[in-house]
Protein backbone atom coordinates (compact mmCIF):
# COMPACT_ATOMS: atom_id res chain seq x y z
CA UNK A 1 0.00 0.00 0.00
CA UNK A 2 1.17 3.52 -0.83
CA UNK A 3 -0.38 6.53 0.92
CA UNK A 4 0.09 10.14 -0.14
CA UNK A 5 -1.51 13.49 0.56
CA UNK A 6 -3.32 14.79 -2.50
CA UNK A 7 -2.29 18.38 -3.22
CA UNK A 8 -1.37 19.03 -6.83
CA UNK A 9 -1.66 15.22 -7.25
CA UNK A 10 1.70 14.97 -9.00
CA UNK A 11 3.28 12.73 -6.36
CA UNK A 12 0.43 10.28 -6.05
CA UNK A 13 -0.07 10.05 -9.82
CA UNK A 14 3.62 9.60 -10.65
CA UNK A 15 4.38 7.17 -7.84
CA UNK A 16 1.26 5.17 -8.71
CA UNK A 17 2.41 4.75 -12.30
CA UNK A 18 5.87 3.63 -11.23
CA UNK A 19 4.70 1.23 -8.51
CA UNK A 20 2.06 -0.34 -10.73
CA UNK A 21 4.69 -1.06 -13.37
CA UNK A 22 6.53 -3.06 -10.70
CA UNK A 23 3.46 -4.59 -9.02
CA UNK A 24 -0.03 -4.11 -10.51
CA UNK A 25 -1.61 -5.28 -7.23
CA UNK A 26 -0.27 -2.38 -5.15
CA UNK A 27 -3.02 -0.26 -3.57
CA UNK A 28 -2.74 3.53 -3.89
CA UNK A 29 -4.53 5.56 -1.22
CA UNK A 30 -4.92 9.33 -1.16
CA UNK A 31 -5.35 11.53 1.90
CA UNK A 32 -8.02 14.17 1.35
CA UNK A 33 -9.20 16.88 3.77
CA UNK A 34 -12.50 16.26 5.54
CA UNK A 35 -15.28 18.80 5.04
CA UNK A 36 -14.38 22.10 6.70
CA UNK A 37 -10.73 21.17 7.23
CA UNK A 38 -8.00 23.51 6.02
CA UNK A 39 -4.88 21.40 5.73
CA UNK A 40 -2.09 23.23 3.89
CA UNK A 41 -0.84 21.15 0.97
CA UNK A 42 -3.93 18.96 0.70
CA UNK A 43 -6.83 20.05 -1.44
CA UNK A 44 -10.10 18.45 -2.40
CA UNK A 45 -10.36 19.58 -6.01
CA UNK A 46 -13.81 20.05 -7.56
CA UNK A 47 -14.18 17.74 -10.54
CA UNK A 48 -14.06 20.61 -13.03
CA UNK A 49 -10.80 21.99 -11.53
CA UNK A 50 -8.74 18.84 -11.06
CA UNK A 51 -5.10 19.26 -12.11
CA UNK A 52 -4.40 18.05 -15.65
CA UNK A 53 -1.72 15.69 -14.34
CA UNK A 54 -4.22 13.84 -12.14
CA UNK A 55 -5.35 10.43 -13.30
CA UNK A 56 -8.32 9.19 -11.22
CA UNK A 57 -7.47 5.60 -12.18
CA UNK A 58 -4.15 6.04 -10.36
CA UNK A 59 -5.87 6.16 -6.95
CA UNK A 60 -7.75 3.18 -5.55
CA UNK A 61 -9.18 4.91 -2.50
CA UNK A 62 -9.40 8.33 -0.91
CA UNK A 63 -9.63 8.64 2.87
CA UNK A 64 -10.73 11.86 4.55
CA UNK A 65 -8.60 13.29 7.34
CA UNK A 66 -9.66 16.05 9.71
CA UNK A 67 -7.39 19.04 10.33
CA UNK A 68 -7.17 18.26 14.05
CA UNK A 69 -6.12 14.65 13.31
CA UNK A 70 -3.50 15.82 10.80
CA UNK A 71 -2.04 18.39 13.21
CA UNK A 72 -1.93 15.91 16.09
CA UNK A 73 -0.21 13.32 13.91
CA UNK A 74 2.38 15.91 12.80
CA UNK A 75 3.12 16.58 16.50
CA UNK A 76 3.35 12.84 17.18
CA UNK A 77 5.76 12.33 14.27
CA UNK A 78 8.02 15.03 15.74
CA UNK A 79 7.72 13.90 19.37
CA UNK A 80 7.79 10.11 18.95
CA UNK A 81 9.70 9.53 15.70
CA UNK A 82 11.90 12.61 15.38
CA UNK A 83 10.33 13.47 12.01
CA UNK A 84 9.67 17.22 11.82
CA UNK A 85 6.95 17.09 9.19
CA UNK A 86 4.19 19.46 8.20
CA UNK A 87 0.45 19.13 8.48
CA UNK A 88 -0.15 17.45 5.11
CA UNK A 89 2.44 14.83 6.07
CA UNK A 90 0.61 14.41 9.36
CA UNK A 91 -2.56 13.81 7.36
CA UNK A 92 -0.88 11.19 5.19
CA UNK A 93 0.57 9.48 8.28
CA UNK A 94 -2.86 9.46 9.94
CA UNK A 95 -4.38 7.85 6.84
CA UNK A 96 -1.54 5.30 6.75
CA UNK A 97 -2.28 4.47 10.39
CA UNK A 98 -5.97 3.92 9.58
CA UNK A 99 -5.04 1.60 6.71
CA UNK A 100 -2.62 -0.30 8.97
CA UNK A 101 -5.37 -0.82 11.55
CA UNK A 102 -7.66 -2.49 9.03
CA UNK A 103 -5.02 -4.28 6.90
CA UNK A 104 -3.16 -6.38 9.46
CA UNK A 105 0.25 -7.50 8.21
CA UNK A 106 0.25 -5.27 5.12
CA UNK A 107 3.27 -3.24 4.05
CA UNK A 108 2.30 0.42 4.06
CA UNK A 109 4.45 3.33 2.90
CA UNK A 110 3.61 7.03 3.09
CA UNK A 111 5.41 10.13 1.87
CA UNK A 112 6.58 12.93 4.15
CA UNK A 113 5.74 15.69 1.70
CA UNK A 114 6.35 18.86 3.71
CA UNK A 115 8.50 20.25 6.52
CA UNK A 116 7.44 21.23 10.00
CA UNK A 117 9.46 24.46 10.15
CA UNK A 118 6.86 26.15 7.96
CA UNK A 119 4.39 25.90 10.84
CA UNK A 120 6.52 27.12 13.76
CA UNK A 121 4.70 30.47 13.94
CA UNK A 122 1.23 28.91 13.72
CA UNK A 123 1.05 27.25 17.13
CA UNK A 124 0.84 23.73 15.68
CA UNK A 125 4.12 22.86 17.44
CA UNK A 126 3.96 24.35 20.95
CA UNK A 127 7.24 24.91 22.78
What is the meaning of each model-derived region?
Residues 20-87, 102, 123-127:
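Active-site/ligand-binding loops adjacent to catalytic centers
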Residues 49, 83, 95-98, 117:
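Short, surface-exposed, charged/polar-biased interaction segments
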Residues 5-15, 88-96, 119:
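Short glycine/serine/threonine-rich phosphate/pyrophosphate-binding segments
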Residues 97-127:
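Phosphate-binding loop/pocket of nucleotide- and phosphate-handling active sites
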